[in-house]
């Protein structure tokens, strides 16, 4: 294989490489054997057409595209490795020569990993705004939240207040004309929940069951239904029931209802205190790690971050987001219709985050390289076993999904993050 690389501009260039006849000939034979199985040529049994007759009738060149498709991926990968390049985006491939009996010549316009000039990344001083101490108020808030989850709604005769739930029928109209989606029956609405258009819930406060209220509201200018945005509407609203939240008493029985593993309220408080302490400690560690890495990134200089890297990160994030939605039964078209957004809006939403994440990844990789971090076979095996346990998979499944190089990369990244974080001090 002949390989050359020509820089065109920062982080961009043209990689030229060849695929030799030593590789082409056996692949031609393989492709021919596969193709001839489906050929029907008069005078020959199906699948038994001699190669010379095929070449004469169809031409050897008719096999070239299949041969190229088979050989190109490995040839490109080998050329990148031989040229010592770190390519960070899909190449633009051009086959410049496919002459019979000659080595094939291919060019690839590639984007390479930008140079990272590291600044200080060890012994950093960082600030974090996360409290480690668990207060009595923290414990009480946790218990109160669980207590409210066990609350029951009971019908009340008095007028509705914020925090109550009302059961209503409503019919909306604009200039006396009803509109789609503006009608509901026996709808349970929590007053103060913000479920409805701003101003709707407030106008029901002070009213009782059996009353009919004309609720006048204006749809927000950015409302998802453009035909309603900015318009004033009247909702004729009939209140059927007013319900108040009734919370259980704060006692040992409540504690047992919340958590069957405890016997008393004191036990529950102690359990929650330990859980909150562990959670706060974890949050504190995460905050220190985030602050230390952010500082290391700020101290570094990245020479012209390629747009392609950011685009690929945006694409990955968008696909991950939409994939999660689909697993919940929400397809992309439904999501965009509900939110009144577009695919482009979603890409723009992830743009800044993608740029930040790309810079962070580059700096951490540069730290790992500068420190000469590597991963032993023992460390790789331990990582595989840990991933298998985390995702409830067989070890062999993990090994099939992740290459040794991918695992080695992840391990060295973890080492770099640990170095940056463990040497940092909090102001």
Swiss-Prot record:
Catalytic activity annotation: [protein]-peptidylproline (omega=180) = [protein]-peptidylproline (omega=0)
SUPFAM superfamilies: FKBP-like (SSF54534), Triger factor/SurA peptide-binding domain-like (SSF109998), Trigger factor ribosome-binding domain (SSF102735)
Record's subcellular location: Cytoplasm
Domain of life: Bacteria
This protein's UniProt keywords: Cell cycle, Cell division, Chaperone, Cytoplasm, Isomerase, Rotamase
Domain PPIase FKBP-type: 163-248
Pfam families in UniProt: FKBP_C, Trigger_C, Trigger_N
InterPro entries: PPIase_dom_sf, PPIase_FKBP_dom, Trig_fac, Trigger_fac_C, Trigger_fac_C_sf, Trigger_fac_ribosome-bd_bac, Trigger_fac_ribosome-bd_sf, Trigger_fact/SurA_dom_sf
EC category: isomerase
One CC-aspect GO term: cytoplasm
One term of GO molecular function: protein folding chaperone
UniProt record, GO biological process: 'de novo' cotranslational protein folding; cell division; chaperone-mediated protein folding; protein transport; protein unfolding
Record EC number: 5.2.1.8
Function as written in the Swiss-Prot or TrEMBL entry: Involved in protein export. Acts as a chaperone by maintaining the newly synthesized protein in an open conformation. Functions as a peptidyl-prolyl cis-trans isomerase.
NCBIfam families: tig
Assigned protein family: Belongs to the FKBP-type PPIase family. Tig subfamily.
UniProt xrefs under PANTHER family: TRIGGER FACTOR CHAPERONE AND PEPTIDYL-PROLYL CIS/TRANS ISOMERASE, TRIGGER FACTOR-LIKE PROTEIN TIG, CHLOROPLASTIC
Domain note: Consists of 3 domains; the N-terminus binds the ribosome, the middle domain has PPIase activity, while the C-terminus has intrinsic chaperone activity on its own.
Protein name stated in the entry: Trigger factor
Species: Streptococcus pneumoniae (strain JJA)
Upper classification of the organism: Bacteria, Bacillati, Bacillota, Bacilli, Lactobacillales
Gene expressing this chain: tig
């Amino acid at each position: 294989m002949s390989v050359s690389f020509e820089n065109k501009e920062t982080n961009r260039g043209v990689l030229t490489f060849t695929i030799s006849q030593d590789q082409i000939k056996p692949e031609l034979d393989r492709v021919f054997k596969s193709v001839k199985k489906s050929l029907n040529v008069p005078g020959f049994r199906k699948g038994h057409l001699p190669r010379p007759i095929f070449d004469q009738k169809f031409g050897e060149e008719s096999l070239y595209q299949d041969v190229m498709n088979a050989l190109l991926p490995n040839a490109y990968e080998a050329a990148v490795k031989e040229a010592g390049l770190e390519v960070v985006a899909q190449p633009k491939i051009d086959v410049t020569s496919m002459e019979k009996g000659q080595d094939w010549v291919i060019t690839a316009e590639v984007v390479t990993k930008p140079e990272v000039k590291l600044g200080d990344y060890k012994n950093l001083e960082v600030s974090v705004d996360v409290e480690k101490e668990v207060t009595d108020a923290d414990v009480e808030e946790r218990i109160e939240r669980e207590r409210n989850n066990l609350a029951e709604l009971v019908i009340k005769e008095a007028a509705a207040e914020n925090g109550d739930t009302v059961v209503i029928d409503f019919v909306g109209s604009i200039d006396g004309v009803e509109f789609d989606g503006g009608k509901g029956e026996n709808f349970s609405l929590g007053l103060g929940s913000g479920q409805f258009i701003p101003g709707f819930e407030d106008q029901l406060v002070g009213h009782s069951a059996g009353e009919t209220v004309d609720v006048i509201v204006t749809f927000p200018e950015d409302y998802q239904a453009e035909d309603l945005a900015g318009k004033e509407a009247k909702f004729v609203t009939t209140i059927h029931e007013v319900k108040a939240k009734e919370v259980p008493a704060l006692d040992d029985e409540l504690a047992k209802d919340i958590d069957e593993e405890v016997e008393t309220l004191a036990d529950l408080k102690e359990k929650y205190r330990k859980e909150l302490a562990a959670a706060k400690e974890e949050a504190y560690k995460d905050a220190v790690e985030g602050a230390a890495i952010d500082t290391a990134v700020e101290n570094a200089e990245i020479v012209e971050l390629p747009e392609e890297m950011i685009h690929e990160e945006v694409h990955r994030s968008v696909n991950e987001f939409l994939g999660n939605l689909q697993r919940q039964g929400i397809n992309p078209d439904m999501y965009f219709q509900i939110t009144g957004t577009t695919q482009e809006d979603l890409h723009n939403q992830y743009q800044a985050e993608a740029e930040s994440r790309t810079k962070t990844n580059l700096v951490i990789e540069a730290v790992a390289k500068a420190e000469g971090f590597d991963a032993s076979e023992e460390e790789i095996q331990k990582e595989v076993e840990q991933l298998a346990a985390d995702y409830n998979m067989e070890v062999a499944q993990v090994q099939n999904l992740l290459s040794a190089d991918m695992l080695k990369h992840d391990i060295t990244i973890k080492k770099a993050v640990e170095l940056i974080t463990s040497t940092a001090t909090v102001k």
